[in-house]
Amino acid sequence: MAFPTYSSYEELLAAIDAGDSGRDILNPATKEVVGRADTHTVDDLNTAVAEAREAYQSFSQTTHEERCALLMDAADAINANAEPLAELLSREQGKPLNGPNARFEIGGAEAWTRATASFPLEPEVLVDDDETYSTLTYRPLGVVGAIGPWNWPVMITVWQLAPALRMGNTVVVKPSEYTPLSVKALVHLFQSVFPEGAIQYVSGDREIGAALSKHEDVDKIMFTGSTATGAKIIEASAPTQKRLTLELGGNDAGIVLDDVDPQAIAEDLFWGAFINTGQTCAALKRLYVPESIYDEVCDALTEYAKNVPMGEGLDENNVLGPLQNEAQYNIVVDLVEKAKASGARVLLGGEENPDRTGYFYPTTLIADIDGDNPLVVEEQFGPALPIIKYTDLDEAIAEANKLNVGLGSSVWSADRDRAIEVASKLEAGTTWINKHGTIDPRIPFGGAKSSGYGVEFGVEGLKGLGQPHVITIN
């Protein structure tokens, strides 16, 4: 299958830039213009949905084998353009090229696309006896609206796009208004291998997302973002009874047990919290540590964190970047200032740089903080981690569970059985042991409580993008 191959970031950008008709997209590290994004209207959205619906008539009749082959071609296209994609992503989102950032995200998008094409989905025999034979299969739903965030724009678009296509649906992709160029580049590559009309792209503000959510000819919405926006999507989609998969806010808790070696867990604790500069739904956002090893954990984490370089993304030495936008920067500043005003102890960071150009906020660790402090109970979504001391494990579990969110959680222990026992008491869609946020395309992922519903990834994720169909013979 022929697909475009771009030898440089500049070539890729030229293929997708909206030119004079678009709006400027700024690099959050430098405030320089990266490129110009489309400004689509609701009429443009209606056209995109109509074209997706028309393409669905034939695309839905293709086989799983045919669609899997197309996904493999799309993965090849990502691989062939990996470096230009990574540079565009770094400039637009702000994340560095190196570390678990831009190149990592593009590689993950390729790997997730291949994995989605590899999962078996055979008819399930429900009953097979002398009286009844019953099978369950999944057929396409129709048109899927994919609304993505700005933190992992390419990866999360693949999480939505690849399984929807695998199941025979057509897709209308609507990226965040902050990171439309990276997503447009990804869609451009997918469109080059899939049938015309099967993948549509619309770029715009929240009006476009709202119109997509309530569009009468859209059958399902996949959304990753805030709980507040998720609630609006639920309301908008209700009159047309759309299927929904919602991956919403997390504010994930981690509980350290008293049998760990603080030095041994410091690096994994750090990256569990600060991957993508803390801008990850399933990042570790509040850490509960027993009094008996509290100072040792704080010291080990501080010692590791202070040596992790932050800066402009195209500098190969950096592995932490800026906040992606001014609104998120202001949220982090406000929450850290409230923590400091309450008397909490700053172990690292905690001060704005008056000479900064972009939205850089230093890696910040806050100790001796009350469990009801805003930095603990509100999702900061940035490079600031509160470390809460506990003396009673049951109370720590209760504190971890008391919020109305439950995307991920983690337990840190040298005792496997003890860790599993604690993990079983945590109210979250996923609980990791001695890691945090290590997702896998084979393993279903979704939230509890107000962190959303439905799951992504694996065979279970595919099923969520199909219409169950039972055939019973008596």
Model regions and ranges:
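N-terminal Rossmann-like NAD(P)+-binding subdomain of aldehyde/semialdehyde dehydrogenases
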Residues: M1-T132
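ALDH superfamily catalytic-core signature
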Residues: F3, A228-D370, I433
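Short loop/turn microsegments at loop-to-beta-strand junctions
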Residues: D20-R23, L284, L407
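Conserved C-terminal structural/oligomerization subdomain of aldehyde/semialdehyde dehydrogenase
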Residues: A29-R36, V218, P309, N353, ...
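Residue-level signal for inorganic ion chemistry
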Residues: K31, R67, L89, G168, ...
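Short, well-ordered beta-strand elements within core beta-sheets of diverse protein domains
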Residues: V34-H40, E54-Q61, A146, G254-L257, ...
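Structural signal for hydrophobic packing residues in well-ordered secondary-structure cores
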Residues: Y56, S60, A75-A82, A86, ...
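Rossmann-like NAD(P) dinucleotide-binding subdomain of oxidoreductase/dehydrogenase enzymes
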Residues: E124-A264, Y390
